[in-house]
Amino acid sequence: MPKTTMPDRFWTKVDTSGECWIWLAHIDAQGYGRFGQEYAHRFSYELHRGMRPIPTGHQIDHICHNRACVNPKHLRAVTNKQNGENRKGPNRNSTSGVRGVTWNKRHQKWCAKFRHNGAYIYVGMFDSLNEAEKRVIARRNQVFTCNTKDRRKRKV
């Protein structure tokens, strides 16, 4: 009886019916699929590139923000900084619900700023949350290279 290959075993654990290819086997506490001792998305990335290893100093970014997705079209090798640029949204403790926008009590305005290379980039103070959001997104798009979420058309 022929031995089952790693790719054959991998494909029995993937649902390819949607845009995101969902890992059906073990999912860890952080939401990532596990394939033996390896992350499923990392195995998928390497498998679809002829088993070439992920470049040194890089990690795999889920462009779709779905940690269980193993679709190679949704995966890219990026640096830690680039992966941080493509964050899904605001911090858990955000009071505005908008990434990079906070309420300034002293000035009674929305303050838009974000971090880049260890320093804050100040965008401005705004009367409306909507205007602050538009301006911080526009400025991040000028500075960041891997923030696909900001570059998608916003639904109004």
State where each predicted segment sits.
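Glycine-centered flexibility sites
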Residues: 18, 25, 31-33, 97-100, ...
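Short, cationic Gly/His-enriched loop motifs
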Residues: 36-118, 137
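A short, exposed loop/beta-hairpin motif centered on an aromatic-Gly-Thr core
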Residues: 119-130
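Extended, polar beta-sheet/loop recognition surfaces of beta-rich domains
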Residues: 81-82, 142-156
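Short helix-coil boundary/hinge micro-motifs
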Residues: 1-36, 64-65
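J-domain helical core
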Residues: 129-140
